[in-house]
Amino acid sequence: MSRKDLANAIRALSMDAVQKANSGHPGAPMGMADIAEVLWNDFLKHNPTDPTWYDRDRFILSNGHASMLLYSLLHLTGYDLPLEELKNFRQLHSKTPGHPEIGYTPGVETTTGPLGQGLANAVGLAIAERTLAAQFNQPDHEIVDHFTYVFMGDGCLMEGISHEVCSLAGTLGLGKLIGFYDHNGISIDGETEGWFTDDTAKRFEAYHWHVIHEIDGHDPQAVKEAILEAQSVKDKPSLIICRTVIGFGSPNKAGKEEAHGAPLGEEEVALARQKLGWHHPPFEIPKEIYHAWDAREKGEKAQQSWNEKFAAYKKAHPQLAEEFTRRMSGGLPKDWEKTTQKYINELQANPAKIATRKASQNTLNAYGPMLPELLGGSADLAPSNLTIWKGSVSLKEDPAGNYIHYGVREFGMTAIANGIAHHGGFVPYTATFLMFVEYARNAARMAALMKARQIMVYTHDSIGLGEDGPTHQAVEQLASLRLTPNFSTWRPCDQVEAAVGWKLAVERHNGPTALILSRQNLAQVERTPDQVKEIARGGYVLKDSGGKPDIILIATGSEMEITLQAAEKLAGEGRNVRVVSLPSTDIFDAQDEEYRESVLPSNVAARVAVEAGIADYWYKYVGLKGAIVGMTGYGESAPADKLFPFFGFTAENIVAKAHKVLGVKGA
């Protein structure tokens, strides 16, 4: 039995699964099988019986369409992925979806498919490994020591995100990040030389990567020597450029775009079996090949060795060991609830008129000392986003730091933070202007899809940004985030709601939270202790006239002040007015029906929503009989205090809308 036989097991399973599903991508798994065989059998440190072992190597398949490569590897090495699951490739409720998805399949470290983002996740994983090692490793006690390996294709390197993240990886000198470039020269449209003629080696050398120039990706010895060389380079990430043939083994489709994204066809699969010397029926793997691939015994020994290291570490450094375990398990500090609630109550008792971006920074200063797991950063807007707090230390200055200067890389930043979140041991936060979530949008969506624990700080949230004008003024962005499944948003109206938003964002384990913050100063509102508690429910009654409301005014963020002014005017007319603060629509929507009804009673149809964002979103709360004071187009370049009245954000306009809803004559 040869190494080719072991690699051919991957090729056969990949061909068979794609053929049975009548859907999928056989070419890349067949082309990268030899590389994967060497990496997984000779180098990868992992334990199939415990896929979450803290010190395992991380393997990322950035070209996620090649998912059958990964599923074949997981099945062959002994993960809980039986053959039946491979037969159900791309079928409903299988553990083998079309693209790898974290949480579905044991051993899958991240969800990949949108090209280039797996590479970004890998950079995040490598950052997390190095930072965690610097924070916890002690002389003679190295408990964090693993590599991050990432497979990528031509498409990954064409995507702009690859530039963002590989540039940063080189700047940070991530020596334990090793990339494998599947240079097969084929994409969906055909031979890439018509649209991708970059000198990839020079490109990555310019990023300060160690580049191992083109090796034969079908020569196991060349692959092995390249990996050994890459592992020996400690101060730079490494890229191994592997010349491969897409659809390797297919007599008529190898090296052609026909092998990329469609089944080979039964006749071609049979011919490929003959050419590869694989004389076994579909989905049949000989016992001796299973035995050669089985990584369970080796993995259990590796983990047991680490367990012994950790036991010695725990004996020598009990407090560090306890903290390491807490952070890797995602737990919160012991005094978290008591300390955060005390801070929130103190804010309410000491009113301040400040921007919510400043309130966010103040909250970081209050919560940060309790949370060494915070690993923050901004896309070159730290002085504006106010994401640097008194305990921030740049990773560039200190490997054990807690702050990343991401540069102008919004997309890369967000996807890197997803990788940091997946690694464990950290709660990443990222920041930019709300408008520039547009650059980061797909990574933000992926965070929600993957249930990544990332906090996104988006400041300058509206026309309140002012003079920079409509290119920088967010209008539809918040509504877009609110409409994203499993994406939590907070638009606080003052420092108290901002502190509650940060608290719940840190506590959320199953998805991202965006904090939508103002540039301009906002007045603090009065609250009772019960109202302070109800902020955490996403929406609550902030002001009430008593009795059944004649009209309900709903507001968020910077528009709360004028809404309260409008309520005073309406109350002066003898009307019962209720003001509802709705900083988090998703959290409010998740409350029980009784609570939601107590805040927004269904028998009160007269409602006006006020928010300096796109108006359409608010019809779900005001109904077709209600009114909205919101944006219906883009902003303008002018001082903020001129823009708000120009676009109708005044107490007088809210009153006028209320009159119309109430049917006041002449309104």
UniProtKB/Swiss-Prot annotation:
Thiamine diphosphate binds at H65, G113, P114, L115, G155, N184, H260, F436. Substrate binds at H25, H260, R357, S384, H460, D468, R519. The active site is at E410 (proton donor). Pfam families: Transket_pyr (PF02779), Transketolase_C_1 (PF22613), Transketolase_N (PF00456). Its cofactor is Mg(2+); Ca(2+); Mn(2+); Co(2+). It is an enzyme of class 2 (transferase). It comes from the Bacteria. The record marks H25, H260 as: Important for catalytic activity. The modification N6-acetyllysine is found at K342. Binds 1 Mg(2+) ion per subunit. Can also utilize other divalent metal cations, such as Ca(2+), Mn(2+) and Co(2+). GO terms for cellular component: cytosol. GO terms for biological process: pentose-phosphate shunt; pentose-phosphate shunt, non-oxidative branch. InterPro entries: THDP-binding, Transketo_C/PFOR_II, Transketolase-like_C_2, Transketolase-like_Pyr-bd, Transketolase_bac-like, Transketolase_BS, Transketolase_CS, Transketolase_fam. It catalyses: D-sedoheptulose 7-phosphate + D-glyceraldehyde 3-phosphate = aldehydo-D-ribose 5-phosphate + D-xylulose 5-phosphate. Mg(2+) binds at D154, N184, I186. One of its GO terms (molecular function) is metal ion binding. Keywords: Acetylation, Calcium, Magnesium, Metal-binding, Thiamine pyrophosphate, Transferase. Its EC number is 2.2.1.1. Belongs to the transketolase family. Homodimer. Catalyzes the reversible transfer of a two-carbon ketol group from sedoheptulose-7-phosphate to glyceraldehyde-3-phosphate, producing xylulose-5-phosphate and ribose-5-phosphate. Catalyzes the transfer of a two-carbon ketol group from a ketose donor to an aldose acceptor, via a covalent intermediate with the cofactor thiamine pyrophosphate. This is Transketolase 2. It comes from Escherichia coli (strain K12). The lineage of its organism: Bacteria, Pseudomonadati, Pseudomonadota, Gammaproteobacteria, Enterobacterales.
